[in-house]
Amino acid sequence: MKFELDTTQGRARRGRLVFERGTVETPAFMPVGTYGTVKGMTPEEVRATGADILLGNTFHLWLRPGEEIMRKHGDLHDFMNWQRPILTDSGGFQVFSLGDIRKITEEGVHFRSPINGEKIFLDPEKSMQIQNSLGSDVVMIFDECTPYPATEDEARKSMQMSLRWAQRSRDEFDKLENPNSLFGIIQGGVYEDLRDESLKGLVDIGFDGYAVGGLAVGEPKADMHRILEHTCPQIPTDKPRYLMGVGKPEDLVEGVRRGVDMFDCVMPTRNARNGHLFTTEGVIKIRNARHRDDTSPLDDKCDCYTCKNYSRAYLYHLDRCNEILGARLNTIHNLRYYQKLMEGLRGAIETGTLDAFVEEFYTSQGREVPEVPELTD
């Protein structure tokens, strides 16, 4: 992987990630394909929304279908028929989410399979081996997602163990002679000094990119912004910056303003299945009876397949009848909305009009533009 940085406006960055399997324009949003599929979508449909790269879930693909079946197909690209870049998470966050059915030690994590209750052990070495089998273009280190709330001492111990796991991940990745890219994950909770220590340790080890982890786990939005404002400028300029698991459209806008290059989140697809649809004027709840006889499209500024062909009334009807097509059309729209937002952000950075773009983004929804500190490096 090669990261090319074209231009900046404030801290916002316009560039691209160049892989053998294709180029990813940044800032970029990655749809989530947890089980080797973006729910309800074919790869061709996902690509048509403007997606250049997908996120796969190491933990779930390891449990089902497993490495052996994956290898029989070649790798995850062949298994799901997506011949473009794929980033896989390490499984650390999913283990974190298991709560009481897992036990974290220095060696790794012991837990019971959420599928059949089988006892399973996952450590940095195994995570690297699984992601190698998946053929991931971007491999994430195995780390512990620091919970919120956590005391500074708790966050320090978690972060320092994640640093030791980062070294083990790097060593195993190199041992496997994996030709792809490995990203480090900055931890430290809401404590700036711990974020500094984490980043320094990761840079000393050396990675192809750096993710900001452990955010969007329940902390106030102001804390997330503060950590991004503090941490992003310290990440090496020539490396991509990835904010994991984020988020709402406004979170992407605010992340880009603070120097983030990559995002992923289940929100556009999950919300689509629940009838919550993103538009330039705000969120539409298609289950609301007000849409029952509305012949207008979801968003007259959207160029997606759904908006060009179907009315709000039809989408309301599909939802009321629990038709699968409704969830699919909603997903197409939400994913296109996210990709169009990223296209707009990229174009605004290129032309030096980011401030005007951000103002239009908020005012078109009847919202005030959030103030941002003077973001100069």
Swiss-Prot record:
Top-rank EC class of the record's enzyme: transferase
EC number in record: 2.4.2.29
GO terms of molecular function: metal ion binding; tRNA-guanosine(34) queuine transglycosylase activity
Pfam families, A to Z: TGT (PF01702)
Cofactor mode of binding and number, as noted: Binds 1 zinc ion per subunit.
Keyword tRNA processing: yes
Annotated positions binding Zn(2+): C302, C304, C307, H333
Upper lineage: Bacteria, Pseudomonadati, Pseudomonadota, Gammaproteobacteria, Alteromonadales
Official protein name in the record: Queuine tRNA-ribosyltransferase
SUPFAM superfamilies xrefs: tRNA-guanine transglycosylase (SSF51713)
Active-site residue numbers: D89, D264
Domain of life: Bacteria
Oligomer status and interactors: Homodimer. Within each dimer, one monomer is responsible for RNA recognition and catalysis, while the other monomer binds to the replacement base PreQ1.
Protein species of origin: Shewanella sediminis (strain HAW-EB3)
Residues reported in the UniProt entry to bind substrate: D89, S90, G91, G92, F93, D143, Q187, G214
Catalytic activity: 7-aminomethyl-7-carbaguanine + guanosine(34) in tRNA = 7-aminomethyl-7-carbaguanosine(34) in tRNA + guanine
GO annotation, biological process: queuosine biosynthetic process; tRNA wobble guanine modification; tRNA-guanine transglycosylation
